[in-house]
Amino acid sequence: MDEQSQGMQGPPVPQFQPQKALRPDMGYNTLANFRIEKKIGRGQFSEVYRAACLLDGVPVALKKVQIFDLMDAKARADCIKEIDLLKQLNHPNVIKYYASFIEDNELNIVLELADAGDLSRMIKHFKKQKRLIPERTVWKYFVQLCSALEHMHSRRVMHRDIKPANVFITATGVVKLGDLGLGRFFSSKTTAAHSLVGTPYYMSPERIHENGYNFKSDIWSLGCLLYEMAALQSPFYGDKMNLYSLCKKIEQCDYPPLPSDHYSEELRQLVNMCINPDPEKRPDVTYVYDVAKRMHACTASS
């Protein structure tokens, strides 16, 4: 069918709609057992659909990744190994990875559906209303985020892409850390083309210098996120900024202080400890989580 006649008959049904017989023996490991409902997101290398499992009715997010176009064989193997690690994570504040399989020449990842807003939407909402987020609310969400990251780090898994858009908040106020950074598996020629997609406000100095990512790089991002919840913008945000000046600001840890009349010394100090140019001097996630628990307890009761 040519494009024109296709257009006259309305949008084409995605070819991965299940036309196959159900495969109860395969569980979540085949497209035949899912009904695709609608596209809910797209990334640089993937598209995400809301879907329902036809076996048990569970709503899921189905992420389809162009694994063969964008990766070499080693990266594919590493990516699949990493997803197997993610499937072992089991925590109320981490988006659950149910299954992954290759079908129709794509990597399909079946995830818990985070059918709610995310932290970036909440920050925008407060900004629009010209109001700061109350400190007790900051700790209420941040403590859950720390709990999620502590679980991941204790299983030797790094997140690699902590930012407000990847922190989902359910209707009942439960934080779900999602979209774990698999981007590093894509070929360098692909990522080079995308290096300016989404300004890297959360990139640590060691990543700028390509010194590799480690657990302390997640802590840098955690500090940037705590700062953004308080200031309603990234510590390194600037209106008329190019990548070079952003990298300079990050290297020098050049960011405006948080207002001391609105936020506690503890919050401001924790931000400063996490946003430290030397990864060795940043605290580990257990320390950050302990501070968050203490502050959540004392602000929730006040």
From Swiss-Prot:
Catalytic reaction annotation: L-seryl-[protein] + ATP = O-phospho-L-seryl-[protein] + ADP + H(+); L-threonyl-[protein] + ATP = O-phospho-L-threonyl-[protein] + ADP + H(+)
Source organism, top-level taxon: Eukaryota
Phosphoserine: residues carrying this PTM: S5, S195
Expression sites by tissue: Highly expressed in lung, muscle, testis, brain, heart, liver, leukocyte and spleen. Lower expression in ovary, prostate and kidney. No expression seen in small intestine.
Annotated region described as NTE motif, given as residue ranges: 20-33
Keywords (A to Z) from UniProt: Acetylation, ATP-binding, Cytoplasm, Cytoskeleton, Kinase, Magnesium, Metal-binding, Microtubule, Nucleotide-binding, Nucleus, Phosphoprotein, Serine/threonine-protein kinase, Transferase
Enzyme nomenclature, EC number: 2.7.11.34
GO biological process: cellular response to potassium ion; positive regulation of NLRP3 inflammasome complex assembly; positive regulation of telomere maintenance; protein phosphorylation; regulation of mitotic cell cycle; spindle assembly
Region annotation Disordered: where it falls in the sequence: 1-21
Name the UniProt record assigns to this protein: Serine/threonine-protein kinase Nek7
